[in-house]
A protein has these predicted regions:
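Extended amphipathic coiled-coil helices
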Residues: 2-168
């Protein structure tokens, strides 16, 4: 709490008016310190099996959505460790060794897509898909994996573009 006193003296036709004004200001600021994790060391505790299963029901959107949920989630700013500083430049910035470093945009995004594909193909998760998804959902997931693993150019380009849009 800080206080201040102001004395104003005004003379008007030999009349003296004294005014005392007291005001008190209270600073109720909250300072939050957020420690951002290095790229590759994200907190994934909040990414539940149920959330991943939900993503797998729409596998063709799963990777960009998982990237957004991991790296651009407002509720988890500690994972906001990759930036696209200028959409016209071929670089991204990642937090590495507690410093922001420039990396090649295309290779970094493709690595990120690969990482999320691996997360979605975790053995226990695949077992859940096999045991609980309808044949139609299983087929859709298998088509997604086949296209990804066969490195189909159109499919890979679409994933890249959707991931880039998440970053903008």
């Amino acid at each position: 709490i800080s206080g201040s006193t102001t004395n104003n003296n005004t003379t008007n036709n030999n009349n003296c008016n004294n005014m005392n004004k007291n005001s008190f200001n209270t600073d109720n600021s909250t300072h939050n310190t957020i420690n951002i994790n290095n790229y590759g060391y994200e907190n994934k505790d909040y990414i539940t099996k149920d959330y991943l299963v939900k993503l797998l029901k729409e596998p063709f959107q799963a990777i960009p959505k998982l990237i957004e949920y991991t790296h651009f989630n407002k509720e988890h700013p500690e994972n906001q460790n990759i930036k696209l500083p200028n959409k016209k430049q071929p670089y991204v910035k990642i937090l590495k060794g507690d410093k922001w470093v420039y990396m090649d945009r295309k290779s970094t995004i493709l690595d990120l897509i690969d990482e999320k594909h691996c997360e979605l193909n975790d053995i226990p998760l695949l077992k859940h898909v096999e045991d609980n998804f309808s044949d139609n959902l299983q087929d859709r997931f298998e088509r997604f994996n086949d296209r990804y693993l066969n490195d189909e150019k159109d499919f890979t380009n679409q994933l890249y573009k959707e991931t880039e849009l998440v970053m903008i």
